[in-house]
């Protein structure tokens, strides 16, 4: 499994006539459920996966309310500690970051917080929209999206960084549609702002 893509449909697709695909990178600690989320999006079913040693990539088309779909090139990068220094190689020039956390494993949220802040503050990622997926909401004791947002100190990310925290589950697909809609909206907003800034110069 790997080297594919899934597409999404836009709410304002007419604004993006020139994009073949939006580049999105999925990162997070090991065992957070990144690959399972990727394949839930692609195959619309839960796929039990093994730890990612490098990366997976899929083209994903997801209806976001518009009549025309938008293709997302989604890169899922391994989260083991030894692989984390490689994240920046994948996030360079990305349109959006998806940071996945295991909401049922509260003891690792501090570690996740450190990695989230490190990657979002990297020079190449300044201002890139961040969608945090609080995965495994199907498990007993999973923290809510609001609690995950608080523990990760998401609001302390750079003021120019658009963020959204969404509870979700790779098992039943809960919350994924809403999360992707918000990510798409944030990407659109950033591109519009960038275009407006160029016109004013």
Curated annotation (Swiss-Prot):
UniProtKB keywords: Cell membrane, Cytoplasm, GTP-binding, Lipoprotein, Membrane, Myristate, Nucleotide-binding, Nucleus
GO biological process, alphabetically ordered: intracellular protein transport; protein secretion; vesicle-mediated transport
Location relative to the cell: Nucleus, Nucleolus; Cell membrane; Nucleus; Cytoplasm
A GO term for molecular function: GTPase activity
Gene3D superfamilies for this protein: P-loop containing nucleotide triphosphate hydrolases (3.40.50.300)
PANTHER family: ADP RIBOSYLATION FACTOR-RELATED
Function in brief: Small GTP-binding protein which cycles between an inactive GDP-bound and an active GTP-bound form, and the rate of cycling is regulated by guanine nucleotide exchange factors (GEF) and GTPase-activating proteins (GAP). GTP-binding protein that does not act as an allosteric activator of the cholera toxin catalytic subunit. Recruits CYTH1, CYTH2, CYTH3 and CYTH4 to the plasma membrane in GDP-bound form.
Similarity remark: Belongs to the small GTPase superfamily. Arf family.
Subunit structure: Interacts with CYTH2; the interaction is direct and ARL4D GTP-dependent. Does not interact with ARL4D.
UniProt protein name: ADP-ribosylation factor-like protein 4D
Species in which this protein is naturally found: Homo sapiens (Human)
């Amino acid at each position: 499994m790997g080297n594919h893509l899934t597409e999404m449909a836009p709410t304002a697709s007419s604004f993006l006539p020139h994009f073949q695909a939006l580049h999105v990178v999925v990162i997070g600690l090991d065992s957070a459920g990144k690959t399972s989320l990727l394949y839930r999006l692609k195959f619309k079913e839960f796929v039990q996966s093994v730890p990612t040693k490098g990366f997976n990539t899929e083209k994903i088309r997801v209806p976001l309310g518009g009549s025309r779909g938008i293709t997302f090139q989604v890169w899922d990068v391994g989260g083991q500690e030894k692989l984390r220094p490689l994240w920046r190689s994948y996030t360079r020039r990305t349109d959006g970051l998806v940071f996945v956390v295991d909401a049922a494993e509260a003891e690792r949220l501090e570690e996740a917080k450190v990695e989230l802040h490190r990657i979002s503050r990297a020079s190449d990622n300044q201002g890139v929209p961040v969608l945090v997926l609080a995965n495994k909401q199907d498990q007993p004791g999973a923290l809510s999206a609001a609690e995950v947002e608080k523990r990760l100190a998401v609001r302390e990310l750079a003021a120019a960084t658009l963020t959204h925290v969404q509870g979700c589950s790779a098992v039943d697909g809960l919350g994924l549609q809403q999360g992707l809609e918000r990510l798409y909206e944030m990407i659109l907003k950033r591109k519009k702002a960038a275009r407006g800034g160029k016109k004013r110069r």
